[in-house]
A protein has these predicted regions:
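Conserved NAD(P)+-binding/catalytic subdomain of aldehyde/semialdehyde dehydrogenases
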Residues: 180-258, 262-268
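N-terminal Rossmann-like NAD(P)+-binding subdomain of aldehyde/semialdehyde dehydrogenases
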Residues: 1-124
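Conserved small-residue-rich beta-alpha loop and adjacent elements
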Residues: 108-174
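Short internal beta-strands
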Residues: 154-164, 269-275, 282
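C-terminal core of ALDH-fold dehydrogenases
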Residues: 315, 323-436
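Short acidic-hydrophobic, aromatic-tinged amphipathic segments that line or gate anion-handling sites
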Residues: 3-9, 183-188, 309-314
């Protein structure tokens, strides 16, 4: 772990090191991803079959790429009561939150008396990527597909990698089915993103791509942006805990360890505190709790490379550091956590008080856990239902309203040398020629 104390002579330099930007950009990965994308574009299903064999160890035919209704039914039959209850609880909260967040049509009159407004319609066909990796991200299926369902997207396409035997995790399959996936394909990685964007013989193209993934998935989304829209480019998980001397160090340590166990080894965790005693107590708690966790080997890698316990001079310095780091998750365990919220401008999600660990947001609270990472929170927000909606403006002018607008149109058309623009408006107020 990296430990930074106020008394350190190089304190400010260490803070700069802690705030160094994280990026999934890798020129080697990007070049490999370009090759995969081009192969899928050129060879379609044949390329998907080849890459599934190479990267996932599964031998499939093109006909086996789609998940069948029988498989979906079997996953539902296999789902036990605890899984059913957890999925239903999470989906209910996600849907409730998303319904409040969904954008709605509006209409009003402008200064000319014309009717102007916006209409919000769902994307007709969306693609959702659900990662595989060292742990099945069942919750990610809910945190993406549910939003598409609430938005009203009629076609929700899901791609997720299969195991060596060609099967999908039954819990993940159950969650995707429950949330509202209309099509599910056993294909992963950048080849899945390419298939959803360019289409193959089996997978028809989508209009927008959603979901997190590894460096290859992120590279594919970056390279294919412009062919379609994408949501975010989220990387490995991040959590920052701001704790004063009132925080329970057991809670702080548990939350840091929880976010370090995802498995990529690139997760980043920070504890920021004004208290030297708190820093020492959290360090001790991490050492005590680590041996009790099943994924301690994954966690240890993150502790060795990307874990920071940082003491700052005061809460003002803490807030400044948080805004520099722009963490994916920001927990505030201070005496008055709500007072700090208006001052935090770049966190993906904020969790207030000692009873609000990040894992609640990961699984059941309601907001989507697909959030910006690597400092992107300064420019991007987390996934919301309105990203599954497309906006269209609507304008309706009557003749009286057009008459009021004509002078302004003529002025701009003259300034820009576009007389056809001016004519397009003016002709509507001219008398109709006789004989027509």
């Amino acid at each position: 772990m990296h430990i930074v104390r106020v008394s350190d002579a190089d304190h400010d330099a260490r803070l700069n090191q802690a705030a160094a930007a994280s990026s999934l950009f890798d020129p080697v990965i990007e070049e490999r991803t370009r090759t995969i994308i081009e192969a899928v574009r050129a060879r379609g299903d044949a390329a998907l079959v080849e890459f599934t064999q190479r990267f996932d160890g599964a031998t499939l035919t093109p006909e086996q790429i789609p998940v069948t209704q029988a498989e979906r039914m079997q996953a539902s039959l296999m789902a036990g009561p605890d899984l059913r209850a957890a999925v239903a609880e999470s989906a209910k909260n996600i849907a409730s939150f998303s319904k409040r967040s969904r954008r709605r049509d509006w209409s009003a009159k402008n200064s000319h008396g014309a009717q102007v407004g916006e209409v919000f319609q769902p994307f007709q066909r969306v693609g959702v990527y659900i990662p595989g990796g060292t742990a099945p991200l069942v919750s990610t299926a809910l945190m993406t597909i549910t939003l598409a369902k609430v938005a009203g997207c009629p076609e929700i396409v899901v791609c997720t990698p299969c195991g060596k035997d060609g099967t999908l995790n039954p819990a993940l399959l159950f969650a995707a089915n429950f949330a509202g996936a209309t099509e599910i394909y056993r294909v992963g990685g950048s080849q899945a993103i390419a298939a959803m964007v360019h289409g193959t013989e089996t997978i028809r193209p989508v209009h927008k791509v959603f979901g997190p993934g590894n460096a290859y998935v992120v590279a594919a989304k970056r390279l294919l942006f412009g062919h379609v829209s994408v949501d975010l480019l989220p990387g490995p998980s991040e959590t920052l805990v701001l704790a004063d001397d009132s925080a329970d160090p057991r809670f702080v340590a548990a939350d840091l360890l929880a976010q370090a166990e995802h498995g990529s080894g690139h997760e980043r965790v920070w504890m920021v505190t004004t208290s030297a005693a708190q820093l020492k107590a959290v360090e001790k708690e991490i050492s005590r709790q680590l041996p009790t966790l099943n994924r301690r080997e994954f966690i240890q890698k993150v502790l060795d490379t990307n874990t920071w316990l940082i003491q700052v001079r005061d809460l003002n310095a803490a807030v400044s550091l948080i805004n520099r780091l722009a963490p994916e998750h920001c927990e505030i365990m201070t005496r008055n956590p709500k007072a700090l919220v208006p001052r935090i401008h770049a966190a993906g999600a904020i969790f207030l008080g000692q009873g609000s660990p990040t894992v609640l947001g990961d699984y059941v609270a309601g907001p989507s856990h697909v959030l910006p990472t690597g400092g992107a929170g300064r420019s991007f927000a987390g996934l919301t239902v309105d990203q599954f909606q497309r906006r269209t403006s609507v304008v309706e002018y009557s003749k009286p309203a057009l008459r009021k607008a004509l002078k302004g149109v003529a002025t701009f058309a003259g300034l820009e040398g576009l007389d056809g623009h001016g004519r397009s408006a003016a002709i509507r107020l001219e008398p109709q020629p006789k004989g027509r």
